Regions:
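Nucleic-acid substrate recognition interfaces
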Residues: 1-189
Length: 189
């Protein structure tokens, strides 16, 4: 009886975006909200740890409510998925800090120095145009795959906008290949 194993592998592509002024304003708003959400998560974590040291027995910090309770309503103007991805990335940063060696603590993000990016999902591709939530269609240049999209990260580098698309890709391997790869890796280590 032959058994094949199926692995889910993530692959990525980067495409260049050509947004108009309105979309550029929207992207900058999303970058600002992403930065603010990260910094609020970090401030909540610091306050939680200080309260723990003073034996005040705090509850676990609720990042969600404090991120959305702001005066300028950035959360309503920006993409709604940003908050979820920021909290997830922040928690992963702390997990890496405690589990891996040579990883620094998560810190506050400066808007000028940090990489201006945000992550979302459910993009729609129609021809050579990309449609994101709460955004008009944007022209892009690059090749796409026909696989399922896991998420998309919009980032700005040198005043140019790019999208990093992460695809889900299935790979089928036979047991002998897995056995051989496992022992080859052990041999190299």
């Amino acid at each position: 009886m032959k058994v094949d194993y199926i692995f889910m592998v993530m692959k990525g592509r980067v495409i260049r975006l050509y947004p108009k002024d309105r979309e550029k304003e929207f992207f900058n708003l999303c970058f600002r909200f992403n930065n603010r959400a990260w910094n609020i998560c970090h401030a909540n974590q610091i306050a939680y740890r200080q309260a723990q040291q003073n034996n005040l027995m705090p509850n676990y910090p609720n990042h969600g409510k404090s991120i959305t309770n702001n005066k300028d309503n950035l959360d309503k103007k920006a993409d709604s998925k940003i908050k979820n991805y920021v909290v997830k990335a922040y928690n992963q940063g702390w997990k890496k800090y405690y589990t891996e060696k040579n990883v620094n603590k998560p810190k506050f993000h400066s808007f000028r120095k940090s990489r201006k990016s945000y992550t979302t999902d459910k993009p729609i591709f129609e021809g050579n145009k990309l449609t994101l939530p709460k955004c008009q269609p944007i022209k892009f240049k690059g090749q796409l795959l026909n696989n399922e999209i896991a998420n998309i990260t919009i980032f700005m580098k040198n005043e140019k906008y790019y999208a990093s698309i992460i695809y889900k890709n299935e790979i089928t391997q036979k047991p002998f290949e897995i056995f051989f790869c496992y022992y080859y890796i052990l041999f190299l280590c």
